[in-house]
Amino acid sequence: MLVFRNRETVNGLETIMNACAWRMVATIAFWTWNISHLVGAENTIFHPASKLELLHTRAAQLNSGLTESPAVAPDGRIYFTDMPFGKDNGMILCFDPKTRQVSDFTKDSGKSNGLTFLADGSMVSCDGADGGGRRLIRWDLKTGKGVTLADRFEGHRLNSPNDLCVDLKGRIYFTDPRYGGAEPRELEREAVYRLERDGKVIEITYEVEKPNGIVLSPDQRTLYVGDHNNGGNRLRPTDPEPKRGAMKVYAFPLDAAGRANGSRRTLVDFGRENGCDGMTVDDRGNIYLACRSLARPGLLVIDPTGRELAFVETGPRNQSGLFDDWKGIPSNVEFGIGDDAQSLYVTVDKGLHRIRAKTRGFHPHLAAK
């Protein structure tokens, strides 16, 4: 069952801490998630009796890595990526909520990380560096074939597209940091971009050090971006070793044209800990953050002002009551649709999990129809 704690019992943890990690999920089918709900006696986000259900764990003996970016297709199936390190190009997998079966969509994803869907039912992936495609790919679900949508900004190769979201007009916002890979960098900045319907890539903001997770508010007026600067990757081999930097979540106001307009707001500052990875929103406008923390791994739910509504622990505790290092770290999160609309899908370590929520997600590729 879920354990609820009031504000007094979690004081001192309101400045959320985080970190990133991976592990092979144990063979148990359920974990207990501890939830701290900080706005009242009744939790409005999760059911007290909900359990975290393990749906899939990697079977192949691949080189480390993690699962990432669950994304819901128009038919309700959940696609997600499996990103091994090293020479393996990674996979895109598909979970069917009706049959509970997981199948391979492609065994050569080009180091795909983030996924999303467009209104026509096609899927778009962010292909990263370290031997990957460093581009956005549009996938045909029927044929399994992909075509490049974008791999350059102003003639220069992208760094390593990481995560993305689509707006109601079908335009794709994406983050382009560089965390690893020996490929030479051609762009000075690690920025947030938007792919227009005509194929042009425009820069939305570079007021982030290492942009990672990204999502739009349901009213399309705010762009949320996670800044996860772990020190990263040198621009040039002769540059000094990069230092760790910002671990924050920002809210960028957007104008009617969907461009950053006005000063950003800091919603969460993770301090010296690592920041969040992927994120999603519900139809109320609340933001769900996958916090990659050794100190407090889990899902942080905040409202648009940054106020904490709930926190879900995804990391297992040891006999001392502490979190085990580099275990149970979430990477991304997504809601289902239809009969599955209150299911929250979470990639943790090398697995896919699900938990029941009281809320429903907001999906632009469906709302745009």
Regions found by a protein language model. Give the residues of each.
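Short, intrinsically disordered low-complexity segments
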Residues: F4-N6, W22, S36, G76, ...
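N-terminal secretory signal peptides that target proteins for export/translocation
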Residues: M1-A21
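Sequence-structural signature of mature extracellular/luminal beta-sheet repeat domains
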Residues: L38-K369
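Bacterial N-terminal signal peptides
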Residues: R23-H37
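Intrinsic disorder/low-complexity segments
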Residues: N6-E8, T15, W33, G40, ...
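Sequence-pattern detector for short linear motifs
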Residues: E8-V10, A26, L141, A357
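Extended rod-forming repeat segments used as scaffolds/tethers
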Residues: L13-T15, A21, V25, R234, ...
